[in-house]
Amino acid sequence: MLNQNLTISQEIAAQPKTQYFTKEDGDALANLLESNPYKEQAVEVKSLLKSERLIESSRVEPEVDWFYCKLGLDSNYFDSTPSIVIARHILSLYAAKMVSHATGAKLEVHLHSKNEGSATFITPSNPGKRDSPAMMIEHAIESHYFGEGYHQDQQLLSPQQVAVAPFPVSPKPPTGTNLPPHGFRLACYRTTGTVSNSSPVHLRLYYLTKPVFPQATNDLSASKNDEILATETDLFKIGDISFIEKSSELTKKIYQEVMNEVVGKQGPVIKHYPYQTNGARLVIAYRRGSTHSYWSAIGELYHFHQMYATHKYVEQFSNGITIYSIYLRPLHPDVDINTKISKIAEQASLVYVLPRTSLTPLFLSHQLSFPEVTYAYVCWKFAYQFLNRYATEYSALAAAIGDDSTKQSMLAQLKTRLSKDTFTEGRVRDAVLQYPELIKILYQDFEKFHFSGSNSNNTQKYDVQHGSEILASIKKTVNNELDSQIFSAILSFNRHLLKTNFYKQTKTALSFRLDPGFLSTKEYVSTPYAVFFVVGSEFRGFHIRFRDISRGGIRIIRSGNSTQYDHNSSSLFDENYNLANTQQSKNKDIAEGGSKGTILLSADHQSKAEVAFHKYIDGLLDLLLPNHEIVDHFAKPEILFLGPDEGTADFMNWASSHAKDRGAHFWKAFTTGKSLSRGGIPHDLYGMTTRSIHQYVLGTLAKLGRNEADCTKFQTGGPDGDLGSNEIKISKDKTIGIVDGSGVLLDPQGLNRDEIGRLASKRQMARYFDKSKLSPQGFFVDVAENDVKLPNGDIVESGLIFRNNFHLNPLCNADIFVPCGGRPESVQLTNVDKMFTATGESRFPIIVEGANLFFTQKARLMIEEKGAIIFKDASANKGGVTSSSLEVLAALALNDEEFDRHMCVKDNVVPEFYENYIKDVHHTIESNARLEFECIWSEHESTKTPRSILSDLLSNKINSLNDSIQTSSLWTDQSLRRKIISAACPKVLLNLLGVDKIMERVPEPYVKAIFGSYLASRFVYKYGLNSNEFAFYTYMETLKQQ
């Protein structure tokens, strides 16, 4: 029983049998302290503790002496930790002992103290144990002090770990205001000794402090300082003041070396150094915010390899760089430290790419290694894209149903539901979790084709038919057909993989270049030239191109909720394929074939668009640039030409600069849509896409004898967007309705043109329309509003749903409909009937599809059946791709000095060459649009073939003829070649360089593509779809004589 008149501390002192230290212990410790190099500091700590009088005075000496002499903390701790902080740590430990004594329970040390500028955590240390309390502490520190935690699967943590957590465990990554401007510094130490003789508990101590950086330059703005700091490498300018003062010269030298390297890189810098006998120092530097959960994942990695940390540090720098320094030792002393540390350093790069996923439990339970579990994650995401389909059955039923649109619509809905219900993402994941032994077999197969090590001769030669024995193993192992299909899809991934950066030492995302032979020709009638698959911790995406020389935009796909994310993830490849295929059709007039890239942001990383884009581009460049670490089974040079699309317009400058930094010779042409100062031609500023779309509107009205000013028009895509704003600016019609991101703006009497023109000039949403300028029948319904009463008395329950479906609403009727925005397949078989009036007529007699894939092909055909005139996207909106193609041509034809002088706008001064080049681009766009419009109109008049089909037939014929021309002897005719290239190139470029210099500078495959596309398109537009070989011969003879 405790004496109620004594404090707990006094009680302990009064009962020698329960003391943690005997008098003999104290004497021995005092003798040890005499030779301790930190004796003076210990004396100061004793003085502090005695002055606070929280520990019984007779206990201060042995407690402090044990802490310094027996606990076994690294000397770095005493060098870098202030005496007052050490005193608090000793007091915390003593408090734990008092609680243990008072309760009679086993000594459990779970201590944490926090204030605004620092925090301390002390916990038992059990190296290599998954259930160690230290693991929970590190997760909490990572989330709340580094701002980079993301623990997707809370089942990874035991109830005991959650119970001792110093904070609530959140599965979400920090975003927005939750992310502190700089993470905390961390010093972590593991004791080699125990708490006392009677309690053999080793401890791990975490000490966190806010960094204090040197003051920023006072005469610069905050944004300018941030810009300068991002590239600053001098530790004395960007390091914490205490770090600079107290770190050893060796540490500063190592940190300076990695800092110099990491600032110019996208990914991490990982190095290791020998430390004492059979120890190693692992140093990792990376840009903060570029990954998540990295700190805890690195700990799990070295635990997997039977290593533990004696002490470790996290240092933050004001330029945004974080550096880890981890001192490792093997759990078993006979282990070769060199082999272990090399393996850890090698895999740390892979951990950076995918630190934590739903498959991480397979790694933590040692069922799979980290490379194996990373491979499994990639295969899971890949297989999911190509399993959710019933191609054979669907084709058979669709053929049996025939032209019955209602039944076709029902069949399409049934197929979608069956596919999603059968192969959900979770269903595929569960199969992977159930059969890790199959993943091991498939990974070994993957490794032997793509890991070269030090000898490239070790790798197997590419063989798309390999793996029959693996297929047999799959069928023997799994117990149902669905799982068999899943693992067969993974084997197909292996079989068709031509190159990957998986084994490249530094990378930011995993990228894979695939032969498209794995695609079903029933589902994907046109086979692409190449498919790239890119996976990062914040995203996954594809890049698809239909020709070697191809160009297309990169699209960020965001998801507002889990339902939308499920839809976006299941349709990711199909959306990418359809966009690229449409691009291929519309690119028939230009040198590049069609391509498209998509980046699907992960559900919990919707704010990481820029980080995801950077990694996506870096991953693609890994496979485009020569690298001895990558086994290249394709063995041909490749170039991608990229452009802006949804969510990426602001990133084109960076992508071009990054390609230059990485040594890509094609850097100027790598991206279009760059800023004026970088020689870009912004589509929105010059209305490039709209210029093509509007030619179809004007052409149709001219054929019908209508005056544009007398026609009503409805458009999706508002005055804040590229197409929407320029459609308002260029048109002279009576616009009655606009739908954009803010809501629905409608006035049957016609919207005030001055007012919508004002919004278009300022690029403002429709919600900023002056409502006083609406007629009594006019209204605006905001997406955020509910239960809104319209002028006709109808009640709008949800503004968001009203906006999403307004193009299908009977209130919306006009002579012309120009979709300038909206999601793909907004009109399809399941809802196209809503486009018609009660008498079966189209609510929009004229439709020019400005937005890509707004209608499905079957929906277009049904609309045409009702008598409407519709021109599909591949024909109507090709102005943007024409502009981008000519932007690429200028970048390839001009050398660096010429490009800077003639194409880059500086200080708002537009070079004369640039102004004239824009005029030439406008002329080319309008000419191409008029030629195709006239061809489609003429063919429809003579054959009655639907215009939507004619558009495809034209593209197919031109593209097919282009391919034939490029492989024919026509290319060898020097005179013809010069003549065609002269006709195809902008006049101002010809005047500057001359045709011979253009042909000399531009890569031959690109020149050949210009030659073929120009010849093929001009012939087909002139002679039509039914032209024969004799007509082509006549055409060629005419050209040669001109």
Swiss-Prot record:
Listed PANTHER family: GLUTAMATE DEHYDROGENASE, NAD-SPECIFIC GLUTAMATE DEHYDROGENASE
Enzyme Commission number(s): 1.4.1.2
PTM summary: (Microbial infection) ADP-ribosylated at Arg-763 by the Legionella pneumophila effector Lart1, which inhibits the glutamate dehydrogenase activity. Amoeba are natural hosts of Legionella, and ADP-ribosylation by Lart1 may promote Legionella parasitism.
Record's subunit section: Homodimer.
Originating organism: Dictyostelium discoideum
GO CC terms of this entry: mitochondrion
Keyword Cytoplasm set for record: yes
GO terms classed as biological process: glutamate catabolic process
Protein name (Swiss-Prot/TrEMBL): Glutamate dehydrogenase 2
Gene: glud2
Family matches, as Gene3D superfamilies: NAD(P)-binding Rossmann-like Domain (3.40.50.720)
Record text on activity regulation: Activity is stimulated by AMP. (Microbial infection) Inhibited by ADP-ribosylation.
